[in-house]
Structure formats: structure tokens, C-alpha cells
């Protein structure tokens, strides 16, 4: 009988956490190279992104294929982010996006998305945020 209150408490915590989640980020990685790309985790933000991704990104992405997954940060309903890193040999692409629902004078909020694509080793990396349809 003592297990039931613990299960209810755990369920309540998970439900409350899900209720404050920020808007999901859909990541679409397109490997347009002629070689296999490897999903790599280096930083703590990349670790958090992997933990919050569903389904989990595949470790190996063959040439000419895509990987699609959603990342939902549990920080706040007004914040989300995704940081991912892919390598092909000595070439690396690091992609980052952040969402902040910025509070303005008068109490209204303006959604702000930022994105970066950082290339190294001769890689060509592009990050886009598609407009809503």
C-alpha cells in the first residue's frame, strides 16, 4: 500500500514537468555528403538535447539520408533549445537553435528563434528555420 502514494507522486512530477515544456524543435539532419555522418556528443547542451530528443538521433547516418527527431526542453514553457553535432572524417558541423518567448513591457511576449551552423575542417553547414505554413 505504501507504493501507491510514491507512484502517484512520481506521476504528478512527470505530468507537471511535461506541462511546462517549451515548444518542440523538429531537427531534420540531411546528410548530403558522399560519406557516412556520425552524430557526436561533446558538450553538456548536446547531452541535454540527446536526452530530450524523441526518437533518439541515430548514431550513424548514411550518405544521402535524413534523420528527423523532435527536441522538447523541460526548462520552461517560454524556452527551448537544441544543440547537435555531426562529423564526417575531419569535417564537423555544429548546429544550435534557441527559442525564447521574450517578455515585453505591458506583459506581452514576442517569440524569438535564433539559429547557428558552425563548420570546421572544411565542412559546409546550413541551418534553417522554416516559416510556419
Task: State each model region's role.
Residues 2-10:
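Sec-dependent signal peptide recognition
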Residues 16-18:
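N-terminal signal peptide c-region/cleavage motif recognized by signal peptidases
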Residues 20-133:
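Intrinsically disordered, low-complexity segments enriched in small/polar residues
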Residues 13:
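Aromatic-rich surface patch/π-platform used for binding flat ligands and interfaces
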Amino acid at each position: 500500500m505504501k507504493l501507491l502514494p510514491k507512484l502517484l507522486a512520481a506521476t504528478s512530477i512527470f505530468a507537471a514537468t511535461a506541462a511546462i515544456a517549451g515548444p518542440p524543435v523538429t531537427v531534420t539532419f540531411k546528410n548530403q555528403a558522399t560519406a557516412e555522418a556520425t552524430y557526436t556528443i561533446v558538450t553538456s547542451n548536446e547531452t541535454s538535447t540527446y536526452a530530450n530528443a524523441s526518437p533518439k538521433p541515430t548514431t550513424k547516418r548514411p550518405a544521402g539520408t535524413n534523420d528527423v527527431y523532435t527536441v522538447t526542453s523541460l526548462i520552461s514553457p517560454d524556452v527551448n533549445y537544441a544543440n547537435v553535432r555531426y562529423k564526417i572524417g575531419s569535417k564537423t558541423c555544429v548546429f544550435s537553435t534557441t527559442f525564447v518567448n521574450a517578455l515585453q513591457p505591458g506583459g506581452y511576449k514576442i517569440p524569438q528563434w535564433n539559429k547557428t551552423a558552425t563548420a570546421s575542417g572544411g565542412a559546409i553547414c546550413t541551418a534553417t528555420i522554416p516559416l510556419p505554413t
